[in-house]
Swiss-Prot record:
Residues 11-74 form the S5 DRBM domain. This is Small ribosomal subunit protein uS5. Gene3D superfamilies: 3.30.160.20, 3.30.230.10. The N-terminal domain interacts with the head of the 30S subunit; the C-terminal domain interacts with the body and contacts protein S4. The interaction surface between S4 and S5 is involved in control of translational fidelity. One of its GO terms (biological process) is translation.
Amino acid sequence: MAYQDEESKEYSEKVVKIDRVAKVVKGGRRFSFNALSVVGDQKGKVGIGFGKANEVPDAIRKSIEAAKKHLVKINFKGHTIPHEVVGKFKSARVILKPSTAGTGIIAGASVRSIVEKAGIQDVLTKSWGSSNPVNIVKATLDALEQLETPILAAKKRGISLNQLFGKD
């Protein structure tokens, strides 16, 4: 039990969306709930999870457990992201742009939740296409997964850092 307590302190959680859905059966409607959660350590690890259950607390618990199982490491240093990036999921599009220190997180609620949990402090964002929070969160995660540090970008291209920044 102690291991689980340590793990829960390590990550902060945010419920992005709770939805009530209905299944129509012969006797009427059968209601259940689903929840979308974001979990992160605010040091570069973030995950999203989706849970479904007949009661809200169970759906939230399941979504948080799913998010902890699907953590992703985000490449960024300091207070902002290293470069502009566009994330896509279905019809949702999210653009993330680096910004100067002190700007804060300029984002909608769905994008803000995942960016905050990743530990990014200053970023400009714009989302368009789908307004469904599930699609927006997944598009944001797609964008964050595309981030790469300058050292990694130079290594991928087989050039030096000076060449990458046009100093050679």
